[in-house]
C-alpha cells in the first residue's frame, strides 16, 4: 500500500516537478519554519537549451524562463499545500522567490536549506544548491507542513572539493571559495550585494532589464555541464 510519502511524491511529480524531497526541520529555529516540523522541497530543472546559451551573462530567454518557472512553482506549491490540507493536515506554501531580510538579501528559511535537509544536494561555493542530476540548473520552492513525512537523509558536507569553476566564472568576484558545511552563514560563501550589483549591470546591458539575474556560476558548474551535455546528446 502506498505511503503518504509515495502518494505525495507521485502527485507532485505528476504536476511537472523534476525533484521532490522531504525534510525534517526540527533542528531549525521554530520561528524560521513558522512552527511546522517538516518541509517539502519541489524543484524544476531549468531548460537546458536556454541555459546552454548563457556565455557572457544573462539572456532575455533566461529571464523569461526564470519568470515562467517561478509561476509554475508557486502554483505547484499551492496545489501541494491544498493536497495536504484536503488530507487533514496543515500546510503552507512559500513563494518561489522572496527576500524577508532586506538588510542581507535573504530569507529566514531559504529553499536551498530545506533542500539540503531533504537530501537533494549540497550548497556549492556559489552559495546555490548543487544536485547530482541537474547541477545548479534548478528553481526551488518549499511547502511547510505538519504531515508525518519520512524525511530524507540530510546532506551536511559539500562535494565540491577543490573545484573553483563557479568562483572563477563570477564577474563580480563575489565568492570567497569557501567550502560549505551545514549551518554555515551565507556571508562566508559570497557577497550577495556584489552579486546583485553585477547581475543588474549585466542584465541591463544584455536585454534592457535591471534584474538580479546572471547565471554564469550556474553554467560553470561541472555538475550543471553534465546535465546540459546529457540533454544536448538526446537532441542530436
Regions found by a protein language model. Give the residues of each.
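Non-catalytic, usually N-terminal nucleic-acid engagement modules in DNA/RNA processing proteins
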Residues: 1-69, 73
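Catalytic cores of enzyme domains
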Residues: 30, 68-236
Amino acid at each position: 500500500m502506498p505511503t503518504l510519502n509515495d502518494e505525495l511524491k507521485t502527485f507532485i511529480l505528476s504536476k511537472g516537478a523534476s525533484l521532490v524531497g522531504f525534510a525534517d526541520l526540527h533542528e531549525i529555529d521554530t520561528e524560521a519554519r513558522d512552527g511546522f516540523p517538516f518541509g517539502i522541497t519541489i524543484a524544476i530543472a531549468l531548460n537546458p537549451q536556454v541555459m546552454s546559451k548563457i556565455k557572457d551573462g544573462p539572456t532575455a530567454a533566461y529571464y523569461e524562463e526564470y519568470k515562467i518557472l517561478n509561476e509554475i512553482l508557486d502554483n505547484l506549491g499551492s496545489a501541494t499545500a491544498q493536497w495536504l490540507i484536503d488530507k487533514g493536515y496543515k500546510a503552507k506554501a512559500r513563494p518561489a522567490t522572496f527576500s524577508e531580510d532586506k538588510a542581507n538579501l535573504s530569507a529566514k528559511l531559504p529553499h536551498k536549506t530545506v533542500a539540503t535537509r531533504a537530501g537533494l544536494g549540497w550548497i556549492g561555493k556559489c552559495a546555490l544548491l548543487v544536485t547530482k542530476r541537474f547541477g545548479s540548473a534548478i528553481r526551488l520552492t518549499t511547502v511547510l507542513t505538519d504531515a508525518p513525512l519520512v524525511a530524507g537523509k540530510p546532506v551536511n558536507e559539500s562535494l565540491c572539493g577543490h573545484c573553483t569553476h563557479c568562483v572563477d566564472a563570477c564577474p563580480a568576484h563575489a565568492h570567497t571559495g569557501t567550502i560549505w558545511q551545514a549551518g554555515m552563514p551565507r556571508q562566508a560563501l559570497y557577497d550577495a550585494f556584489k552579486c546583485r550589483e553585477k547581475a543588474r549591470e549585466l542584465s541591463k546591458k544584455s536585454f534592457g532589464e535591471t534584474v538580479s539575474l546572471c547565471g554564469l556560476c550556474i553554467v560553470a558548474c561541472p555538475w550543471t555541464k553534465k546535465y546540459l551535455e546529457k540533454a544536448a546528446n538526446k537532441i542530436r
